[in-house]
A protein has these predicted regions:
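NTP-dependent nucleotidyl-transfer catalytic core
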Residues: 1-226
C-alpha cells in the first residue's frame, strides 16, 4: 500500500469510504489530499443522540486521577500564541475530563530555570551594578520589592539573549551566574524569587483573562532538589 504514489493511495482510501453514510462526499485531489464533506443529516442525528444521552454519551466508568501539564509559559517572557493555544486546549481537556467524573490535577509547569535566569541576572548587573545582590560584602536582608517591573523584565531577557549571541564574555558570565543560582547562591536566589513573583502575578492575570486556571504552579526549578 505504501509503495505507491500519494494520489493512488488517496484514491484507494476514497474508494473504501464511498458507501459510508457519514460522508456527503469524499474525493482525492492532487498530489494526494483527501477532501471530505460530512453528511449534515448524519451530524445532526449524531449530535442530537449525544444531547439526549446521559452525560452527552460519556461512558460510565470508575473515576481516574489525571494530571494534565499545559500552559508551559516561561517566566520573564510574554506569552505568545503557542502558549495561548496550549492553554485553551489544556483547559478544555481538563473541563471535559472533570465533566466525565475524573479527578483532574492541572499544572502550568513553568519554564523557570536554566540559562535564561543567568542571562537576566547578568544583564541586570550590567544595568544596575549598585544593587545589593551584586555586593559580595553585603550581609543584610534582601529587599522585598523587586528591582524591576514586569515590563522591564520582559525587555531585559530578549536584550540579554541577543547580547549573548555576539558577546562571548557576557555569555560566559551568564553561564557562571546560572551555575551559582543552581548551586544555591543566596543573592541570585533572591533575584530569582523576585523574577518568579513578578512573572507569576502577571501570568495569573493573563491566564485569568482566558478563564484558564491551574491547580499547581510547578516549574522546572521544582526538580532541582532531585
Amino acid at each position: 500500500l505504501y509503495h505507491k504514489a500519494p494520489i493512488m493511495i488517496a484514491n484507494q482510501v476514497v474508494e473504501s469510504l464511498q458507501d459510508n453514510e457519514m460522508f456527503e462526499s469524499v474525493e482525492a485531489v492532487m498530489p494526494g489530499f483527501i477532501n471530505i464533506k460530512l453528511n449534515s443529516e448524519f451530524v445532526a442525528k449524531y449530535l442530537n443522540d449525544m444531547k439526549e444521552a446521559d452525560k452527552y454519551g460519556c461512558e460510565n466508568k470508575a473515576p481516574e486521577t489525571i494530571v494534565i501539564d499545559y500552559g508551559g509559559a516561561n517566566v520573564a517572557k510574554p506569552l505568545h500564541v503557542g502558549h495561548l493555544r496550549s492553554a485553551v486546549i489544556g483547559e478544555s481537556v481538563k473541563r471535559i475530563e472533570r465533566f466525565m467524573g475524573n479527578k483532574v490535577i492541572s499544572d502550568v509547569h513553568l519554564g523557570d530555570w536554566g540559562l535564561q535566569m543567568g542571562l537576566i541576572i547578568t544583564e541586570l548587573e550590567c544595568r544596575k551594578p549598585d544593587l545589593v545582590y551584586f555586593d559580595e560584602s553585603y550581609t543584610g536582608e534582601y529587599p522585598e520589592e523587586a528591582p524591576f517591573t514586569i515590563s522591564e523584565l520582559e525587555e531585559i531577557y530578549p536584550c540579554a539573549s541577543a547580547k549573548s549571541k555576539v558577546d562571548e564574555e557576557f555569555k560566559e558570565k551568564a553561564h557562571q551566574a546560572t551555575l551559582k543560582l543552581q548551586s544555591g547562591y543566596a543573592p541570585y536566589t533572591a533575584i530569582w524569587k523576585h523574577i518568579m513573583k513578578v512573572s507569576v502575578e502577571d501570568l495569573k492575570k493573563n491566564y485569568g483573562n482566558l478563564n484558564v486556571d491551574f491547580d499547581l504552579w510547578k516549574g522546572e526549578s521544582d526538580a532541582q532538589p532531585y
